[in-house]
């Protein structure tokens, strides 16, 4: 790889100075890589170098995916974090392929298909609904868990949420109502937690595809740089504990979507979301004025 391409490995230079096609590819790669943070994963230097080859037009996305697969198949010296990096690398490339397409099957089958495609070559259970109940200890909840849906009703619940969204009309509503509605739709879909693993990444990709499909311009940098906030905001939107005096709160997720869709600048740091935030972190500030809001074409 040349010195120039090495310099561009963080993608920022492509976003600032690249050709339009390079900017688009760099933005998608940055989003795909950033989404790995929801599970504490980091990609390898090899993945970033391969991504640059794709951005430069030297290889297509399928060739990039093949290179990554071959890299791990032929690697002789194993590192302690190879399994995690392999997952992050392969999933990032898979997400890049998905987000490079403008197609979306907005149905239960389409949602399940996104999971299958995101985790193709990574999980044996990719594209399969879970068949057991789950709990997950959350840092933002001080070790407690969200109550996820029981496994017997997963498909029925996804069917219902998507059917309700299909008939919802965005015509004539305010941007505030639009954001509130999108927040609750995405929160409800995520709370189902349809899969054994990879629910947040699947929901994020499906959300990006859906918002684009109804005419909204999505600021990919929000998912690229604040994916863990996105996950923690989903957790807070779906957690209630009467003994602790904690109710469901959508405000943190709404602020993520206000930044994403309206150009607002809420400070998206995770400490504001902790159920026992210190006084310093109790009030989440808005940093800058808004830009011109969007109206969806639906």
Residue spans of the language-model regions?
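FIC/Doc superfamily catalytic core
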Residues: 1-298
């Amino acid at each position: 790889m040349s010195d120039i391409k090495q310099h561009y490995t963080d993608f920022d230079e492509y976003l600032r100075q690249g050709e339009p096609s390079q900017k688009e590819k760099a933005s998608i790669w940055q989003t795909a890589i950033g989404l790995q943070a929801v599970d504490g994963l980091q990609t390898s230097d090899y993945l970033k170098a391969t991504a640059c080859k794709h951005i430069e037009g030297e290889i297509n996305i399928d060739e990039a995916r093949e290179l990554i697969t071959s890299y791990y198949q032929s690697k002789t010296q194993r590192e302690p974090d190879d399994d995690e990096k392999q997952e992050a690398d392969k999933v990032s490339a898979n997400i890049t392929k998905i987000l490079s397409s403008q197609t979306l099957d907005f149905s239960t089958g389409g949602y399940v298909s996104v999971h299958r495609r995101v985790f193709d070559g990574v999980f044996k259970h990719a594209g399969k609904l879970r068949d057991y109940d789950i709990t997950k200890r959350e840092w933002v909840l001080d070790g407690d868990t969200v109550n996820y849906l029981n496994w017997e009703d997963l498909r029925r619940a996804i069917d219902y949420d998507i059917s309700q969204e299909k008939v919802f009309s965005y015509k004539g509503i305010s941007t505030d109502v639009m954001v509130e509605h999108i927040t609750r739709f995405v929160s409800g879909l995520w709370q189902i937690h349809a899969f054994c693993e990879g629910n947040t990444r699947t929901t994020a990709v499906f959300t990006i595809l859906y918002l684009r499909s109804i005419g909204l311009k999505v600021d990919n940098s929000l998912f690229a740089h604040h994916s863990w906030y996105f996950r923690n905001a989903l957790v807070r939107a779906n957690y209630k504990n009467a003994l602790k005096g904690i109710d469901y709160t959508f405000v943190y997720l709404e602020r993520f979507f206000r930044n994403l869709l309206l150009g607002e600048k809420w400070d998206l740091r995770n400490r504001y979301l902790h159920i026992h935030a210190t006084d310093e972190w109790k009030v989440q500030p808005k940093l800058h004025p808004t830009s011109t809001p969007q109206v969806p074409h639906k």
